[in-house]
Amino acid sequence: MKRSMYAGRVREEHIGTTITLKGWVSRRRDLGGLIFIDLRDREGVMQLVINPEEVSSDVMATAERLRSEYVIEVEGFVEARQQANDKLATGMVELKVSALTILNTAKTTPFEIKDDVEVSDDTRLRYRYLDLRRPEMLENFKLRAKVTHSIRNYLDDLEFIDVETPMLTKSTPEGARDYLVPSRVSQGHFYALPQSPQITKQLLMNAGFDRYYQIVKCFRDEDLRGDRQPEFTQVDLETSFLSEQEIQDIVEGMIAKVMKETKEIDVTLPFPRMSYDVAMNSYGSDKPDTRFEMLLQDLTVTVKGNDFKVFSEAPAVKAIVVKGNADRYSRKDIDKLTEFAKQFGAKGLAWVKVTDGQLAGPVAKFLTAIETELSSQLKLAENDLVLFVADTLEVANNTLGALRNRIAKDLDMIDQSQFNFLWVVDWPMFEWSEEEGRYMSAHHPFTLPTPESAHELEGDLAKVRAIAYDIVLNGYELGGGSLRINQKEMQERMFKALGFTADEANDQFGFLLEAMDYGFPPHGGLAIGLDRFVMLLAGKDNIREVIAFPKNNKASDPMTQAPSLVSENQLEELSLQIESHD
């Protein structure tokens, strides 16, 4: 029989009609001789009623065999329910079954197919096809489909060209580790799976495509966390002849369209802009969450000359004030915050509380001489908690930024209904890597430096600024972009500043440098993390919830057991040999 409609779409207007439905048995109940079935499909749940006085003995026998997750086909008459169920979209109607066929049986599932099920993440991933049956998960992927549909329509209307770029590319330095693919034909040589289509999309601008986009898979072999996966999807854009502001205008319009069409939210344009330095100094993060206050306060000048040497001799002293919540934090709680702070390089955490109008706590006695000035600068009031970090400016900012976010979550200070978009601009071109012992690109080595700072490529790299911009949403980096280098001489200077010899630069990026000899236009673009964007729109805290078949925190798939061993024959074909490190 042909399915008439989705079970979850049956409504009052269908009363009096005979329809055919197909789906899964969500639940079976026997009540007073009647059998009630909750039939589930991707659109929802519909109640079926099987009355032994109105169906054949064969139908009744089939109904008695039904168990959860059996796949069935039913035909019946739509009636009004005697008792409506306002928890279901189909709650005003039910289907009086006249015919029933079992299309497939099912074993007892390892967990219930319902929202809010308590089961380990690895079990969910091991049986991902069952996990995806849960209504909550289905809704996540309907949302994702709406987002990509909206993005494609918007960019198509602006005459962007959707171009696929290679999945087998050249391994290049900078950035995260590559996933490598050995070549059978060119033995000893390897492809890399792309971390982004960065260079190829720039070459498309050189080809005259003018406006490119792609919703593309990317790969990075890096440590995982809640908002990262080894393979992920990004909305990739590149344009020719546009300014930084023009590119941002396009992106803002795209996001506004997505928010309107998927969440029915009108976002205010243009988005606020904040410099990198302000973000770090006031929020302790280059991706600040602006849904709450608790800004970092610089006390370095205030405490200079103080008898408390931990403060007076530190390069920087900064603090955050937890307003009106000191009584929520016992000494044990603050000890936990101190251990948390040490993860970010802080040696410790000093603190005081405002109690009966006075500063109280382990360091209060050292602050007596500046108590009035301190209270005025921090605008202290009764029951405030002040947390201090005395260290380098970088450690103080990073530590207090992390504490700020943690405390806001602990105290439920964040309005989860808000979507605060923000541009972070005026980035440093380079960041110092302790691990590498050198400066590395803050974004990538193709970013255009500002005209005012480009001369420092041969001088103090810490002073070079980039024409780069990140878009931030609720404390997450949603995407990043920049204007790109299009002059060969500037690109060679950039490679040299990063420590490449001329031969190394030519070996790794010779094809790009050669392309710059053939009229490379000014260009720039941006990439947005699609998984992260959908995660935030869905109100989730892990991108696994919006990726159909994700990896776990060990970058493995419990369902398929990937990555897996391969045969000796396969290794021999590739001239590979695995060394044991036991």
Swiss-Prot record:
Keywords: Aminoacyl-tRNA synthetase, ATP-binding, Cytoplasm, Ligase, Nucleotide-binding, Protein biosynthesis. It holds the Pfam family tRNA-synt_2. It comes from the Bacteria. ATP binds at residues 220-222, 229, 477, 529-532. Its EC number is 6.1.1.12. InterPro entries: Aa-tRNA-synt_II, aa-tRNA-synth_II, aa-tRNA-synth_II/BPL/LPL, Asp-tRNA-ligase_1, Asp-tRNA-ligase_1_N, Asp/Asn-tRNA-synth_IIb, AspRS_core, GAD-like_sf. It catalyses: tRNA(Asp) + L-aspartate + ATP = L-aspartyl-tRNA(Asp) + AMP + diphosphate. Gene3D superfamilies: Bira Bifunctional Protein, Domain 2, GAD-like domain, Nucleic acid-binding proteins. GO terms for cellular component: cytoplasm. Its main location: cytoplasm. SUPFAM superfamilies: Class II aaRS and biotin synthetases, GAD domain-like, Nucleic acid-binding proteins. Residues 198-201 are annotated as: Aspartate. L-aspartate binds at residues 174, 220, 443, 484. CDD domains: AspRS_core (cd00777), EcAspRS_like_N (cd04317). Catalyzes the attachment of L-aspartate to tRNA(Asp) in a two-step reaction: L-aspartate is first activated by ATP to form Asp-AMP and then transferred to the acceptor end of tRNA(Asp). PANTHER family: ASPARTATE--TRNA LIGASE, MITOCHONDRIAL, ASPARTYL/LYSYL-TRNA SYNTHETASE. HAMAP family: Asp_tRNA_synth_type1. Belongs to the class-II aminoacyl-tRNA synthetase family. Type 1 subfamily. This is Aspartate--tRNA ligase.
